[in-house]
Amino acid sequence: MKINVNSVKFKVDSKLESLIKEKIEKLSVLYDSILSSDVILKLDNTSTIDNKVVEVRLAIKGNDLFSKKQSKTFDEALDNATDALKKQLTKHKGKVKKI
């Protein structure tokens, strides 16, 4: 599976990038038909503490799955996004088995 990590207006350090790849690869264990994934990291332009945004798009056969989460840290936002994608993958997997 191909994993693309993009950041908007800042450089991602290697530690965060390796964490992202590790979390996304764990999703492929749950559902093996993931073709690729795009992860976008952004800093929201607000005065609140929760200004780190993580968007994850998984390309699978048929439809793409998407999750966007905002939190205090990129790690926490990534955890929340991958948890949401796990639920979506489980639901999608159930639909595929019914067909």
Feature-to-residue mapping (PLM):
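N-terminal, polar/charged subdomain of small-to-medium soluble alpha/beta proteins
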Residues: 1-99
